[in-house]
């Protein structure tokens, strides 16, 4: 039941089936990419330089909390480099043959996107090393004493990998990425621009204060902002005249129990448990997860990043600690 609650959570930053319409409003080029100014400027330079040399872009690792646009950036890289995007994920690549099939189908300049790369098995990693370094694929032919290794040349390609947990990558894999980019939570101004752009593409009339109200409650995350926009659009259609202003957006999000800080019942429950059961901490993440009937990964990837970024919780060597700001504002 807890897992279902997390999946159905409106401000869950993880991608779900309901987010499929977002594909139609994602930026396709760096010029359309909003926010992340450091990442955008660096990628513009790296991509232009690689294109001028007629080379594949260096392998690129993108990490950060979910919902910030790692997949979008991978698509942009492929489009800017003029190559095809081949997508997969760490959990899907179970056998060596799975990765070998993808690598041998690549063409020069293509981008291979591997999401959740921290979940690759050691066997798959070993195949990736020569593919990334030398554009070669080492495969075994035959079995037993007659087995032999052969090398296949691969066309120059770019591996773009995404992860929410960069610390779980092995050093040999991490060191093979020439470009490493960290995506940060978005500020309200950039999210307001993202929401306004999405509303325009969805043909939803919206005022500036309506966009600001949605952005303020979107937890610094574009995926959540777009999801909230769709629900506010529904509310405006039924309870208003179809247009979104600050009052309509505020009423809609209040109805959905997303407060002005972007927090919902699970955030407040986390804070209350840490305060009441663990006296404000320090408390181990496993203990907090057990008290919430959630798994550790869910807390670390979904609930905690925003609470920590906003200054409500500290992650220390001894465990999680509630800050005075959280006590003053929420308890």
From Swiss-Prot:
GO terms for biological process: DNA recombination; DNA repair. The gene is ruvB. Its main location: cytoplasm. The keyword DNA repair applies. This is Holliday junction branch migration complex subunit RuvB. The RuvA-RuvB-RuvC complex processes Holliday junction (HJ) DNA during genetic recombination and DNA repair, while the RuvA-RuvB complex plays an important role in the rescue of blocked DNA replication forks via replication fork reversal (RFR). RuvA specifically binds to HJ cruciform DNA, conferring on it an open structure. The RuvB hexamer acts as an ATP-dependent pump, pulling dsDNA into and through the RuvAB complex. RuvB forms 2 homohexamers on either side of HJ DNA bound by 1 or 2 RuvA tetramers; 4 subunits per hexamer contact DNA at a time. Residues 260-331 are annotated as: Head domain (RuvB-H). It comes from Psychrobacter cryohalolentis (strain ATCC BAA-1226 / DSM 17306 / VKM B-2378 / K5). ATP binds at residues 25-26, 67, 70-72, 133-135, 176, 186, 223. Homohexamer. Forms an RuvA(8)-RuvB(12)-Holliday junction (HJ) complex. HJ DNA is sandwiched between 2 RuvA tetramers; dsDNA enters through RuvA and exits via RuvB. An RuvB hexamer assembles on each DNA strand where it exits the tetramer. Each RuvB hexamer is contacted by two RuvA subunits (via domain III) on 2 adjacent RuvB subunits; this complex drives branch migration. In the full resolvosome a probable DNA-RuvA(4)-RuvB(12)-RuvC(2) complex forms which resolves the HJ.
């Amino acid at each position: 039941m807890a897992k279902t609650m997390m999946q159905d959570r409106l401000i869950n930053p993880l991608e779900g089936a309901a987010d499929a319409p977002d594909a139609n409003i994602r930026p396709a080029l760096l010029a359309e990419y909003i926010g992340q100014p450091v990442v955008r400027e660096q990628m513009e330079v790296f991509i232009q330089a690689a294109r001028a040399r007629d080379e594949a872009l260096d392998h690129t690792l993108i990490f950060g909390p979910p919902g910030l646009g790692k997949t979008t950036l991978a698509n942009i890289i492929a489009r800017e480099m003029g190559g095809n995007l081949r997508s997969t994920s760490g959990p899907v690549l179970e056998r060596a043959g799975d990765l070998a099939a993808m690598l041998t189908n690549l063409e020069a300049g293509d981008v291979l996107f591997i999401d959740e790369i921290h979940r690759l098995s050691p066997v798959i990693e070993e195949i990736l090393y020569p593919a990334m370094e030398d554009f070669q694929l080492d495969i075994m032919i035959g079995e037993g004493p007659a087995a032999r290794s052969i090398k296949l040349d691969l066309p120059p390609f770019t591996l773009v990998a995404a992860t929410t947990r960069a610390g779980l990558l092995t050093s040999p894999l991490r060191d093979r990425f020439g470009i490493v980019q960290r995506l940060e939570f978005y500020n309200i101004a950039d999210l307001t621009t993202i929401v306004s752009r999405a509303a325009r593409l969805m043909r939803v009339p919206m005022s500036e204060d309506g966009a600001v109200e949605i952005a303020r409650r979107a937890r610094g995350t574009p995926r959540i902002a777009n999801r909230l926009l769709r629900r506010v659009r529904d509310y405006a259609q039924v309870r208003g005249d179809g247009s979104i202003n600050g009052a309509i957006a505020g009423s809609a999000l209040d109805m959905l129990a997303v407060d002005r800080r972007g927090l919902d019942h699970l955030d407040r429950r986390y804070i209350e448990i840490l305060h009441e059961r663990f006296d404000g901490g320090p408390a181990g993440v496993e203990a907090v997860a057990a008290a919430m009937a959630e798994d550790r990964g869910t807390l670390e990837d979904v609930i905690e990043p925003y609470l920590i970024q906003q200054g409500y919780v500290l992650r220390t060597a001894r465990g999680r600690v509630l800050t005075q700001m959280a006590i003053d504002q929420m308890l």
